[in-house]
């Protein structure tokens, strides 16, 4: 019988979650059921940190709809994952003093699924559809009259026996969320009266989010540590809170403390191969690959083949942040490493 030591050191610590890319902004199962994360959600616009311009625009639209006693115009929120689109949808409903019913487009497989959702709505309620760009064509077309005239136009039967039936709907507000604005068809996009982009967060905004959450989970972060973690969080609250939870794991299990310093954060994130820029091994491999081609533009499919990854994942998950921090540029001929990106990658080695 083999005897395995239960001692945990710095090198072994990351193995428990090595399959998870911590800097991926998409939600993971752990985050869907984490009660602390639910407690961290703001209850109103005042508690929502960041997105000041967006909140101001929405505040005016909401107050105007309340003043006129009309439903808020259908609203489209777009931006990278993890920036708060779902949270904003719930806050909009809260400000309107109504319920928010939530659905995801992939789960709306058949026309009758969207019909059921629409018929279940009450006057003034909010219907939130996440990943709305993934609605199939038939389902999307049913939304046209529902959004425009608050009615459903249904075709009953087939061939010569087919007949049309119109069902009036209560006045409601549809809030759609998407990470791929260009993938939404023009007829659907044009039916949203309000369209707002959710931007990446500033370091100061992320720092405040981190400080607030650290109090909920009984961690002590000094001012420098909270700002340092904010800089690593890729402008995304979801990533900031995820990294903070992993730092907590390291602090409590390896260092036996609830006091978080800059040095402890560096050690914890190094165990997951995350560096001071918030980049992980996949980001660095991408940049290394470009650096090997000596300022020659490379097509996305060629990069994906070279790295053994999916091109769509690279385009929508890896590249946006590399572009944001000035390490990557897209050209008609392909992807190019910038001078800043080259300086960064030259300072690293392949065995980070």
Curated annotation (Swiss-Prot):
Subcellular location(s) per record: Cytoplasm
Binding site for DNA: 330, 335
Source domain of life: Bacteria
Gene3D superfamilies tied to this protein: 1.10.8.60, P-loop containing nucleotide triphosphate hydrolases (3.40.50.300), Winged helix-like DNA-binding domain superfamily/Winged helix DNA-binding domain (1.10.10.10)
Coiled coil location: none
Chain segments carrying region Small ATPAse domain (RuvB-S): 202-273
Binding, Mg(2+): 86
GO molecular function, one term: four-way junction DNA binding
Pfam families in UniProt: AAA_lid_4 (PF17864), RuvB_C (PF05491), RuvB_N (PF05496)
Residue numbers spanned by region Large ATPase domain (RuvB-L): 13-201
EC class (word): hydrolase
GO biological process: DNA recombination; DNA repair
Enzyme Commission no: 3.6.4.-
GO (cellular component) term, any one: cytoplasm
Residues that, per the record, bind ATP: 41, 82, 85-87, 148-150, 191, 201, 238
KW Membrane (keyword) present: no
Entry keyword DNA repair: yes
Reaction catalysis annotation: ATP + H2O = ADP + phosphate + H(+)
Keyword tags: ATP-binding, Cytoplasm, DNA damage, DNA recombination, DNA repair, DNA-binding, Hydrolase, Nucleotide-binding
First-listed, main subcellular location of the protein, grouped into a coarse class: cytoplasm
Functional description taken from the UniProt entry: The RuvA-RuvB-RuvC complex processes Holliday junction (HJ) DNA during genetic recombination and DNA repair, while the RuvA-RuvB complex plays an important role in the rescue of blocked DNA replication forks via replication fork reversal (RFR). RuvA specifically binds to HJ cruciform DNA, conferring on it an open structure. The RuvB hexamer acts as an ATP-dependent pump, pulling dsDNA into and through the RuvAB complex. RuvB forms 2 homohexamers on either side of HJ DNA bound by 1 or 2 RuvA tetramers; 4 subunits per hexamer contact DNA at a time.
Protein family membership: Belongs to the RuvB family.
PANTHER family reported in the protein's UniProt record: HOLLIDAY JUNCTION BRANCH MIGRATION COMPLEX SUBUNIT RUVB, PTHR42848
Family annotation (NCBIfam families): PRK00080.1, ruvB
Entry note about domains: Has 3 domains, the large (RuvB-L) and small ATPase (RuvB-S) domains and the C-terminal head (RuvB-H) domain. The head domain binds DNA, while the ATPase domains jointly bind ATP, ADP or are empty depending on the state of the subunit in the translocation cycle. During a single DNA translocation step the structure of each domain remains the same, but their relative positions change.
Protein name per Swiss-Prot or TrEMBL: Holliday junction branch migration complex subunit RuvB
């Amino acid at each position: 019988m083999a005897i395995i030591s239960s001692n945990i050191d710095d090198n072994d610590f990351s193995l428990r979650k090595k399959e998870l890319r911590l800097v991926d902004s998409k939600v993971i199962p752990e985050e869907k059921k984490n009660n602390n994360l639910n407690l961290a959600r703001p209850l109103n616009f005042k508690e929502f940190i960041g997105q000041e311009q967006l909140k101001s625009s929405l505040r005016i639209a909401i107050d105007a709809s309340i003043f006129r006693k009309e439903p808020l115009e259908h609203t489209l929120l777009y931006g990278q994952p993890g920036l708060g689109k779902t949270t904003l949808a719930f806050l909009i409903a809260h400000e309107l003093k109504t319920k928010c019913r939530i659905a995801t487009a992939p789960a709306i497989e058949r026309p009758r699924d969207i019909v059921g959702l629409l018929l279940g709505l009450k006057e003034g309620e909010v219907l939130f559809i996440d990943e709305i760009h993934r609605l199939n064509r038939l389902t999307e077309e049913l939304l046209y009259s529902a959004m425009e005239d608050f009615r459903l136009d249904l075709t009953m039967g087939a061939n010569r026996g087919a007949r049309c039936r119109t069902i009036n709907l209560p006045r409601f507000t549809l809030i759609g969320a998407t990470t791929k604005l260009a993938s939404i068809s023009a007829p659907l996009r044009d039916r949203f009266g309000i369209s707002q982009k959710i931007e990446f967060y500033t370091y100061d905004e992320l720092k405040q989010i981190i400080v607030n959450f650290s109090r909920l989970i009984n961690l002590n972060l000094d001012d420098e540590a909270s700002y340092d973690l904010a800089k690593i969080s890729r402008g995304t609250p979801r990533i900031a809170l995820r990294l903070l939870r992993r730092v907590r794991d390291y602090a409590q299990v390896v260092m036996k403390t609830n006091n978080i310093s800059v040095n402890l954060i560096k050690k914890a994130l190094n165990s997951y191969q995350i560096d001071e820029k918030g980049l992980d091994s996949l980001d660095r491999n991408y940049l290394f690959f470009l650096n090997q081609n000596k300022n020659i533009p490379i097509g996305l499919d060629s990069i994906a083949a070279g790295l053994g990854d999916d091109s769509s994942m690279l385009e929508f998950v890896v590249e946006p942040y590399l572009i944001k921090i000035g390490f990557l540029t897209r050209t008609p001929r392909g992807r190019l490493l910038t001078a800043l990106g080259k300086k960064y990658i030259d300072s690293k080695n392949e065995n980070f």
